[in-house]
């Protein structure tokens, strides 16, 4: 019975090897291919199969996804025992010179003879579908972020600019009935003061929406201008450190960094009850990192956010638009540390 089962298993495995759409390759320790099924011939030719050329797999490989990059040859899976114990994504060049993504395994199946089995399953359609879904997801997040921004602008216009304009309108109407010249001059001066304040409010709102210096000069200049204005308006000191100098980044990245830092500072202003805020911007290798730290009230991350909660939500949404992440470390009475990390 055992012998019959063994024969049947051998037959099934052979049929699977011959008819599977999965590409199956057997190679020795030197990378020389000693056998492969028909499916694998989309990538490896008969010459690769029967020649004595070592590392034929390496010749067709365009890198695999690891901690270093999406397509990297560092810590090659042909040599790394850690990688060989897992499934991984690899990019192989087909015979018509197209680079395709595959889910792969590379396993030692005969230790005595040093024979490895290399299997490949094409995941092009799955990745394409994932990218479409990701684009749709990011589009929804973009629209959501835009709507939240519009709501914020609408609130600020209603609470400050429109209220002040209504005040000016009322006072101008009353001037028509003012017969006391001295009182008339006082009212006119008051209106002049309100209008000047309105101009400042609108100018500040314009800077918050999109500072010209961000487009023209980059993050460093935009932050220095914003921090100076912030200190003048609120009396809170900003301690700023940076190593980016005048380095320019992608426009979307600069916008996200500026907005997240701005939102973190405004949250500290509203809730932290502090006299100073530390802001750091640094480029470390292939990452841009921004930190906003205060030693204020802090909060319980598990509790419902104060206010609308759109600030923290918006920071995460913005970061995701450029494949970044926001980490918030805080405790009640121990301050808050907001860290933005963006790959560049």
Swiss-Prot record:
Alphabetical UniProt keywords: 4Fe-4S, ATP-binding, Cytoplasm, Iron, Iron-sulfur, Kinase, Metal-binding, Nucleotide-binding, Phosphoprotein, Transferase, Two-component regulatory system
Metal-binding found in the keyword field: yes
GO molecular function, one term: phosphorelay sensor kinase activity
Major subcellular location class: cytoplasm
Database matches in Pfam families: HATPase_c, HisKA_3
Catalytic activity: ATP + protein L-histidine = ADP + protein N-phospho-L-histidine
Highest taxon listed in the record's lineage: Bacteria
Cellular localization per UniProt: Cytoplasm
Details of cofactor binding: Binds 1 [4Fe-4S] cluster.
One of the record's GO cellular component terms: membrane
Transmembrane segments: none
Known EC number: 2.7.13.3
Residue positions, PTM Phosphohistidine: 158
Residues the record lists as binding [4Fe-4S] cluster: 58, 61, 73, 76
Domain Histidine kinase: 152-344
Entry PTM: Autophosphorylated.
Cofactor(s) listed: [4Fe-4S] cluster
Function in brief: Member of the two-component regulatory system NreB/NreC involved in the control of dissimilatory nitrate/nitrite reduction in response to oxygen. NreB functions as a direct oxygen sensor histidine kinase which is autophosphorylated, in the absence of oxygen, probably at the conserved histidine residue, and transfers its phosphate group probably to a conserved aspartate residue of NreC. NreB/NreC activates the expression of the nitrate (narGHJI) and nitrite (nir) reductase operons, as well as the putative nitrate transporter gene narT.
PANTHER family per UniProt: NITRATE/NITRITE SENSOR PROTEIN NARX-RELATED, NITRATE_NITRITE SENSOR PROTEIN NARQ
Name of the protein in its database record: Oxygen sensor histidine kinase NreB
Organism per entry: Staphylococcus aureus (strain Mu3 / ATCC 700698)
